[in-house]
Amino acid sequence: MWSSVANLKENLNKIAHDVHDDDEDDDEDLTIYGSTNGGTDRRNSNGFRYSRSPMANGFESPVNPEIERYKAEINKLQKSESEIKALSVNYAALLKEKEDQISRLNQENGSLKQNLTSTNAALKESRLDLSRASNNNAIKGNGDHSPNRSQRSPTNWKNRNQMNNGIASKPNGTENDSESHKKEKEFAEMLEERTRSMASAQARELEKEREKSANLQILLQEERKQNETFKEELQSLRLDKEKTLMESNKVRRELDAKLAEIRQLQMKLNGGEQHAFGISRENLKEVNKALEKENNELKLKRSELEAALEASQKSTSRKLFPKSTEDLSRHLSSLDEEKAGTFPGKEDMEKSLQRLEKELEEARREKDKARQELKRLKQHLLEKETEESEKMDEDSRLIDELRQTNEYQRSQILGLEKALRQTMANQEEIKSSSDLEIRKSKGIIEDLNQKLANCLRTIDSKNVELLNLQTALGQYYAEIEAKEHFERELAVAKEDAMKLSARLKDVDEQLESSKKEKEEITSKVLHAENIAAEWKNRVSKVEDDNAKVRRVLEQSMTRLNRMSMDSDFLVDRRIVIKLLVTYFQRNHSREVLDLMVRMLGFSEEEKQRIGLAQQGAAGKGVVRGVLGFPGRLVGGILGGGGGSPDSHPNMASDNQSFADMWVEFLLKDAEERERREAEDAANKEQEKATVSSTQRPKYEQSDSEFSTVPLTSSNSNHRLSRLLT
């Protein structure tokens, strides 16, 4: 019991020493932060000389949001300080409760020692009483006589008998003496047997009590070993926690180094007004938000781990120390009660043994429960460690991506530096305006520094108050750990705020350059849209022309269908004139006459009157020489007016070729009409004139094939029919 209390005191002293060491480290960190604060202000002022103001870029100065952030941080610190005070009060109450428990345990230990001494004395007295009672019962059968009388009783009884008998005979005396000796021997043997039985029973009871005490000591040793294992596990958990903190600090340092590299690159690019890295402001804000979220998640995880460690420490301490002490007190009190009431009967001893066994089983069950809880906590901590390792891997991936982006930005910077050399001439005019803005910014920075100094003073005053609380509480300073942790987070938050302000300035400059690039791209897009609209207009015009051509085709096909009924009896007047002229020019050529016969569809009698006989295909080779037509076309035309049934098989193929040529002719006629319409519209629009000029040679080439004998539409056929009638 005393060893467990001593272990508790040693652990508490170690915690107090650790807290004192952490306080000294945090004080050194605060002094370093205060000393570096001026250096950072100077660096910022020197950086503002080379950087352009946000007002020149067209944006408002980011002073107001920074002030609001600082105010919000101050409010958070005040809330955290109030929480620290509440925690300190709660911890003080807990410490008082623990001190009360320790005092109670000391009192219980003192009472247990007194009970042990009293039980030992009671055992001795009970043994003496038992020996006296046994002697008295053996001699007189009553327990009222004293032990001195019981010892003298046999000798007095002998003397009295001898005196009463007077002068007795020797044989009677010898017989009486022998009987008395026998009785005395029997009585002595009975006493010895009883004393032996009582001694053996007492020895057995003592051995049982010794075994119980040995078992209790073994249990105590096992509990001590378990306490040591729990302490080792707690130390391992603390080491793991420190490792995770070291890894998170490494990640933060790497991020800070990368941010410093980005700042240097941005300081190089601050002189150029119209150039940027190619990354928009929204993307950088998202990156900043993502980094802030990751930092918050790491902080939350750290707080959760600390809470879990504290909970595990409290649970282990509550399960190990108070329960063990209560069990020991119960066991000892039960032993005292049982020792006080064992010797009258054995049933009480057996009941007490059963109680002790039940209590041992309950203690073992509680021990198993504690082990199960420890295993569960270990598994939970391992899962958290795996999750943290996965998140660290994700952070490393993000860091690699940031490195790649930095390398890409460096390559862009090399290209941008060439452009910056050209803009150096414009910087002299910008410097004059930037100097005024730098002065304004210096004034703002001084105000902010004053506010920061006030904040630091308030923090120092709060630190003094916390130190006073530490002196009042004594060794148990666990609440200062939380306060110092918050101060470290404050310093980190301030550094992050400075970094974010510098980032915002760089992002503003990048936004300007990105806006300019956006304007250029929009101008290009508008130009491309105009070109696309022109092409769309042209395509729509071509589609309209195609629709018109389709309509003309449909009309011409309807005309053809109408004309096909009367085409067998109609021939163009100009064809007949051309045939007659060629007939007389060639001195009444037989071939021309045969062609006229086929053309006009003479009967056999009319041919005999003229002096022509039927000839198979005499006029097919003459057609191209006379009219300039292909042979199949003219053959179809000539065979169109024939009424004899013998000429129909040849006419079918010729009519088919003529139909194809006729469709082509109608298409070209429609194109000529559209060309005329396009020429009329060309006077109003220049673009249509260029399109119509490209189409003109095609139309001329298409018309050259029928230049010798121009065929007309249904109107010419009607005229020819009128002449024939």
Swiss-Prot record:
Entry's Gene Ontology cellular component terms: Golgi apparatus
UniProt keyword annotations, A-Z: Coiled coil, Golgi apparatus
Protein name: Golgin candidate 4
Protein's job: Golgi matrix protein playing a role in tethering of vesicles to Golgi membranes and in maintaining the overall structure of the Golgi apparatus.
Compositional bias ranges of the Acidic residues kind: 21-30
Keyword Ribosomal protein: no
Coiled coil recorded as keyword: yes
Coiled-coil intervals: 66-132, 191-316, 344-407, 437-563
Comp. bias intervals (Low complexity): 711-725
Major location (coarse): Golgi
GO biological processes: Golgi organization
Domain-level remarks: The C-terminal domain (556-725) is necessary and sufficient for Golgi targeting.
Domain GRIP as annotated: residue spans: 562-613
Region (Disordered): 17-62, 134-183, 191-210, 311-349, 672-725
Annotated localization: Golgi apparatus
Biased composition (Polar residues): 148-175
Biased composition, class Basic and acidic residues, residue ranges: 324-349, 672-688
